[in-house]
Amino acid sequence: MSGQQSQINAGGGNGQGGDTPEFDAGQVSINSAGTDDLLDEIDGLLESNAEEFVRSYVQKGGE
């Protein structure tokens, strides 16, 4: 899934039509390649040593 890019479009306007002015829709592009790489790395760590992975994120001393 590396190299894929997701696109999210948000509509504008009030949805009633008529003579009311229309607003341009906002557009956001999200590059998910970095996220996919990070998730692949986490999966690899979990496969090799899940207990150590969990320990590294557990806070010590109730902090």
From Swiss-Prot:
Where are the stretches annotated ARC ATPase binding?
Answer: 19-57
Q: Does the keyword Cell inner membrane apply?
A: no
Gene Ontology molecular function terms on file: proteasome binding; protein tag activity
Q: Which InterPro entries match?
A: Ubiquitin-like_Pup (IPR008515)
The domain of life for this entry's organism is Bacteria
A GO biological-process term: modification-dependent protein catabolic process
Keywords in alphabetical order, please. Isopeptide bond, Ubl conjugation pathway
Residues in cross-link Isoglutamyl lysine isopeptide (Glu-Lys) (interchain with K-? in acceptor proteins)? 63
Task: List, alphabetically, the Pfam families matched.
Answer: Pup
What does the UniProt entry state concerning the protein's domains?
A: The N-terminal unstructured half of Pup provides a signal required to initiate unfolding and degradation by the proteasome but is not needed for pupylation, while the C-terminal helical half of Pup interacts with ARC to target proteins to the proteasome.
Q: What does this protein do?
A: Protein modifier that is covalently attached to lysine residues of substrate proteins, thereby targeting them for proteasomal degradation. The tagging system is termed pupylation.
Q: What is this protein called?
A: Prokaryotic ubiquitin-like protein Pup
Q: Which organism is it from?
A: Corynebacterium aurimucosum (strain ATCC 700975 / DSM 44827 / CIP 107346 / CN-1) (Corynebacterium nigricans)
| Gene that specifies this protein | pup
